[in-house]
Curated annotation (Swiss-Prot):
It is a multi-pass membrane protein. It holds the Pfam family ATP-synt_C. It comes from Mycobacterium tuberculosis (strain ATCC 25618 / H37Rv). It comes from the Bacteria. It is found in: Cell membrane. This is ATP synthase subunit c. Dicyclohexylcarbodiimide (DCDD) binding to the active glutamate residue inhibits ATPase in vitro. F-type ATPases have 2 components, F(1) - the catalytic core - and F(0) - the membrane proton channel. F(1) has five subunits: alpha(3), beta(3), gamma(1), delta(1), epsilon(1). F(0) has three main subunits: a(1), b(2) and c(10-14). The alpha and beta chains form an alternating ring which encloses part of the gamma chain. F(1) is attached to F(0) by a central stalk formed by the gamma and epsilon chains, while a peripheral stalk is formed by the delta and b chains. Keywords: ATP synthesis, Cell membrane, CF(0), Hydrogen ion transport, Ion transport, Lipid-binding, Membrane, Transmembrane, Transmembrane helix, Transport.
């Protein structure tokens, strides 16, 4: 097998992980900003705001783990001889 294919798989896997990490970081930051803004405006609504926040963060992190699975597929399923 051509070594450029293996190198391409590794570079592609790295790009997938980098994009997923950047997206997850931005998503978590936006959700955290909305939570802090909401609690600062209405402190009594803190209990009602935490549930949607944790659901949003969980979905964002789930998308990152899906990226991790695709990275593993690209890197480890590439046949290298």
């Amino acid at each position: 097998m051509d070594p450029t294919i293996a190198a391409g798989a590794l570079i592609g896997g790295g790009l997938i992980m980098a994009g997923g990490a950047i997206g997850a970081g931005i998503g978590d930051g936006v959700a955290g900003n909305a939570l802090i803004s909401g609690v600062a405006r209405q402190p009594e609504a803190q209990g009602r705001l935490f549930t949607p926040f944790f659901i949003t963060v969980g979905l964002v992190e789930a998308a990152y783990f899906i990226n991790l699975a695709f990275m593993a597929l690209f890197v480890f399923a590439t046949p290298v001889k």
